[in-house]
Amino acid sequence: MSAQDFLVELGTEELPPKTLVSLADAFLAGIEKGLSGAGLTYSAKQVYAAPRRLAVLITALATQQPDRSVNLDGPPRQAAFDADGNPTQAALGFAKKCGVDLSEIDQSGPKLRYSQTILGKPTTSLLPTIVEDSLNDLPIAKRMRWGARKEEFVRPTQWLVMLFGDQVVDCTILAQSAGRHSRGHRFHHPQDVRISSPAGYLSDLRAAHVLADFNERRQIISKRVDELATQQEGTAIVPPSLLDEVAGLVEWPVPLVCSFEERFLEVPQEALITTMQDNQKYFCLLDAEGKLLPRFITVANIESKDPAQIVAGNEKVVRPRLTDAEFFFKQDKKQKLETFNDRLKNVVFQAQLGSVFDKAERVSKLAAYIAPRIGGDAQRAARAGLLSKCDLSSEMVGEFPEMQGIAGYYYAKADGEPEDVALALNEQYMPRGAGAELPTTLTGAAVAIADKLDTLVGIFGIGMLPTGSKDPYALRRAALGILRILIEKKLDLNLVETVKFAVTQFGAKIKPAGLAEQVLDFIFDRLRARYEDEGVDVAVYLSVRALQPASALDFDQRVQAVQAFRKLPQAAALAAVNKRVSNLLSKAEGSIAQTVEPKYFDNANEFSLYSAIQQADHAVQPMAAERQYSESLARLAMLREPVDAFFEAVMVNAEDANVRANRYALLSRLRGLFLGVADISLLG
């Protein structure tokens, strides 16, 4: 079957840069779906996106649908004809439905059947609907109308190119009649651009100063920004999201170096970086020590004959932004950080839980409780907790919300607070996302855990549990943050006692009955997803969860040990034995004796297992004390042979009550050894 290349380009006013890639990808996906549904084959696909256009190129697209054979089954033969062989209404109705005479219906089988061949339609007749459906299905949060037209799209449309081979596909979509003329760069080439063929699309636009390939523009910007940064003896800060956004703003990227006055460097560099990145879409430069340089890179959308004019314009625009940041910083520093707490008494944290100041006081007490239990200083943690929310009422954070915690750090430093106290004001929000940085100080870790735990206990205490996708207080993230800090920083904190202490801080504001258990279950349940992401089988998690360790670090150490144990050749058999023993013990009548009496042994294999258990117990006790769980399970794996021999030769439920009870006690000792690490019966 013959094939031709197909190109569709929709020209628009400037598209939202942050959603440009997702719109383009959805456009391609919609066209792929339409082609697949129509049975049209092709060899390759490519999507293009620029500020004023979305385009899709399909290579070697079939020029026509394949013919299709369709079989329609009708009524059973005995229902289609009466005793005299005359057609019934069922037969006549089926023929009418098929649009043919009854004589054209196949009557040889058990049912009447009509077979027909549906000729494939020309691809050109199908493309308009496929393209239109794809555009209508784009994930556009809010569509707009323009002029007096009824059509709706994310931005007003300007032109439409649709070529199949070298021929225009005749159609009108979103108020635009298809043609072969695109448009060049708004300034360098404002005239129409004739697209010679689908394959020539990129080169035709390149000649008109338009780089239609988003990835090409992104690579050019990234490479040139790095080159310019090196020339300035610095390193560019290039967040992927900012790079994507800038690539979505320009058709012909030209990065240029600009500068600002060095006096602005007295302002916290995070504030300067925030305003330059978020408001101006600039790439900031750092020196070898990570300090902000008084220079930045802007990406122009024009190759100017006088670049200095563009540089001067950007420097003029950024100056008021930096001046604002400087003003807020100086205003805030006119008073001590602690005095900002008074303003927080009138700021509601949560209606039932009090003000932000109330929260800061609770965090202070809880951090002081946590700090010495993880090796930190209670007084410094209490101080950091008390100051933790002060900067929320500062001018700086009011203008730049991203500066919360960071501003507090700088103001605390200026007030002469200890370094770890100042750092804790920023570290309280860590980790700020999945895989993000953790606190570096014990004071910061204590405040971070306290802040998150206070939120968890408080919100759970008033019954506002997260449901489905709704988690307005980010409780899942808070729980995961606590776990990451404790596990990755190797902090051995008893969460059971800590949560109970946190509950006492709220007084009558919450309902304490069963609250601590509910919060603990929520926190430890988050570990399940964490381990699944790491490739740990859920059975391993459940085997440790059954023991309900109080420490997240201890929990993790047990999980790692069980994970290693599962790789041992004896693991499966011992897991099965533990399951068997668990079932036997659960059915035992009365209480099981705590001690084993060798005098009741009547089989050599009982003596062998008892001796092996005694030796194993003696070996693993010091391991358990040091939480050497992997070593402990490896030692217990040596019990497989005496255990197997025992079950092969010994009937546990002996007729003699004393012998039977003694065997239950022996098996209880065996199971107890493994339960020192995990319930491995759940691994089977």
Swiss-Prot record:
Keyword Ribonucleoprotein among UniProt keywords: no
GO biological process: arginyl-tRNA aminoacylation; glycyl-tRNA aminoacylation
Highest taxon in the source lineage: Bacteria
UniProt-listed InterPro entries: DALR_anticod-bd (IPR008909), Gly-tRNA-synth_bsu (IPR015944), Gly-tRNA-synth_heterodimer (IPR006194)
EC number: 6.1.1.14
Keywords: Aminoacyl-tRNA synthetase, ATP-binding, Cytoplasm, Ligase, Nucleotide-binding, Protein biosynthesis
The keyword Protein biosynthesis appears for this protein: yes
Main location: cytoplasm
Reaction(s) catalysed (UniProt annotation): tRNA(Gly) + glycine + ATP = glycyl-tRNA(Gly) + AMP + diphosphate
Location within or outside the cell: Cytoplasm
Enzyme class: ligase
Coiled coil: none
SUPFAM superfamilies reported for this sequence: HD-domain/PDEase-like (SSF109604)
Any GO molecular function: arginine-tRNA ligase activity
Subunit structure: Tetramer of two alpha and two beta subunits.
Alphabetical list of NCBIfam families matching this protein: glyS
Protein family according to the UniProt entry: Belongs to the class-II aminoacyl-tRNA synthetase family.
Classification via PANTHER family: GLYCINE--TRNA LIGASE, CHLOROPLASTIC_MITOCHONDRIAL 2, GLYCYL-TRNA SYNTHETASE
Protein's UniProt name: Glycine--tRNA ligase beta subunit
Species, as recorded: Pseudomonas savastanoi pv. phaseolicola (strain 1448A / Race 6)
